[in-house]
A protein has these predicted regions:
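Serine-hydrolase catalytic core recognition
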Residues: 1-277
Length: 277
């Protein structure tokens, strides 16, 4: 049974919607799957603000129902809540995720090798733009970890498309992140690759960043160093880009305290309400 006391009173437990599977094509003809959440009281005559959601990993896959992993169970619940609050939400299973075959998982030039999965971000945005029920001036994006990376990429490279974003413990410079899973990595010894890795990072495009962002991070994160958000905030400050920060002291990557998940999602909703409505 559900631990009812852990469910926020505002969560629409009695009016969950069934998301729809959506398949769209990236510019290089790769098919991308997603789950589309329409508002609870959907009206075909209205135009809604819309959000893209990107999972972490990247070796993950979002589902058409609650997830078996707690991190993504929470994210699915948040997408349900956003739909209940009159947002159209598209959760994107971008390339390098699992469940669509080896070629999809080991996608050419993904991640630090060229960020080819960014094509899926743009394809998802174009799908939303093609819908008559979406307000093209109010498209945002959010995600955690690898999804935070793609959120930051969207804002850095295409603030002309994305009006706002929420970046939860996202990676912003591949040359920093690689050291987490390959401690011997030395960018100075691999200059060509290091240049490619940097150019596959949000920090490489921060000069183009215009749209507001909320940065959420625990300061004891061992997966994505807290310094990633600190360094991005400093770069945004120099660019006079509006940003907010929510920092959880002594919190790790996958938040240990349920109340911190709730607080982060409350802040996410509040930020989008102020910046996109």
């Amino acid at each position: 049974s559900l631990a009812k006391k852990s469910i926020p009173k505002s969560f629409p437990i009695a009016s969950l919607i069934q998301p729809k599977q959506i398949i769209f094509e990236a510019s290089d003809k790769i098919q991308i799957h997603g789950q589309l959440f329409l508002p609870t009281d959907y009206d075909t005559n209205k135009k809604y603000p819309a959000l893209l959601y990107f999972h972490g990993g990247s070796r993950r896959q979002m589902l058409l129902s609650f997830h078996h992993r707690g991190y993504y169970h929470n994210a699915y619940a948040m997408n349900q809540f956003l739909a209940n609050q009159n947002y159209i939400v598209l959760s994107v299973n971008y390339r390098s995720g699992i469940g669509y075959g080896m070629e999809f998982r080991e996608a050419i030039n993904y991640g630090a090798n060229g960020a080819s999965e960014y094509k899926d971000v743009i394809a998802a945005a174009k799908y939303l733009q093609s819908r008559n029920d979406v307000d093209q001036k109010r498209i945002g994006l959010w995600g955690g970890s690898y999804g935070g990376y793609l959120t930051a990429m969207g804002l850095a490279r295409n603030s002309d498309i994305f009006a706002a974003g929420v970046d939860i413990h996202g990676a912003h410079d591949w040359n920093i992140i690689i050291k987490n899973f390959r401690p011997s990595y030395n960018p100075q010894a691999r200059e060509d690759f290091a240049k490619k890795a940097y150019n596959s990072s949000p920090m490489a495009f921060v000069d183009n960043w215009k749209s507001p962002v909320l940065l959420i991070h625990g300061d004891d994160d061992r997966n994505v160093p807290f310094s990633e958000s600190v360094d991005l905030a400093e770069a945004l400050r120099k660019q006079n880009v509006y940003f907010e920060q929510l920092i959880f002291p002594d919190e790790v990557h996958g938040f240990l305290l349920h109340k911190n998940w709730v607080r982060s999602f409350e802040a996410t909703y509040d930020f989008f309400e102020r910046k996109m409505k």
